C-alpha cells in the first residue's frame, strides 16, 4: 500500500545556490549527502522538509533544460514486494525489480504514460533517512 510521498527529486546545476534556496531561504534542513556508489563522488543531497519528507538534489545538471530539472517522484510504501506484485498483476510497467539502494531502503521503479519516472520506496529503520529523523 502507498503510504505517502517520500521525496521529490531535482537535478541542480549549482548545488550551493540550491542549498541556499532550500535551506537558507525556505528554512529546510540539509540532512545528509550520499556519495556515488561507484565513484565515491558527491551524488545526492537530502533536504529534510518535514518528518519523513525530503527533497533530493542531484549534483550535475548539465546546461539549460527548458523542461525543468524534474528527476522523479518517490512514493513511500509499506511493502516493496507487494507493490511490485501489484504492478505486475495490473499490467503496469515495472522498470526494475525491488533492490536495496545506497541509502539502505528498498526501491523499485515504474513510469507513467508520459515517461515520468516514479520510484516506490520502503523505508528501512536503519536507513540514512530514518537516522536523519532521530
Label each PLM-derived region with a short phrase.
Residues 9-53:
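Core segments of cupin and vicinal oxygen chelate
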Residues 1-17, 71-73, 124-134:
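N-terminal beta-strand motif that seeds the catalytic metal site of vicinal oxygen chelate
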Residues 5-13, 44-48, 63-134, ...:
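Vicinal oxygen chelate
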Residues 52-55, 115-117:
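Short, charged/polar, Gly/Pro-enriched secondary-structure boundary elements
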Residues 58-63, 122-124:
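Acetyl-CoA-dependent GNAT
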Residues 36-39, 63-65, 99-102:
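A short beta-turn/loop motif at secondary-structure boundaries
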Amino acid at each position: 500500500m502507498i503510504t505517502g510521498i517520500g521525496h521529490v527529486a531535482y537535478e541542480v546545476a549549482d548545488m550551493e545556490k540550491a542549498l541556499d534556496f532550500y535551506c537558507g531561504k525556505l528554512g529546510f534542513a540539509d540532512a545528509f549527502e550520499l556519495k556515488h556508489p561507484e565513484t565515491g563522488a558527491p551524488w545526492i543531497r537530502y533536504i529534510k522538509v518535514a518528518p519523513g519528507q525530503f527533497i533530493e538534489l542531484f549534483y550535475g545538471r548539465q546546461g539549460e533544460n527548458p523542461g525543468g530539472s524534474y528527476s522523479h517522484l518517490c512514493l513511500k510504501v509499506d511493502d516493496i514486494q507487494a507493490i511490485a506484485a501489484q504492478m505486475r498483476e495490473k499490467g503496469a510497467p515495472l522498470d526494475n525489480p525491488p533492490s536495496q539502494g545506497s541509502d539502505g531502503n528498498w526501491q523499485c521503479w515504474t513510469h507513467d504514460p508520459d515517461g515520468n519516472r516514479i520510484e516506490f520506496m520502503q523505508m528501512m529503520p536503519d536507513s540514512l533517512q530514518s537516522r536523519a529523523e532521530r
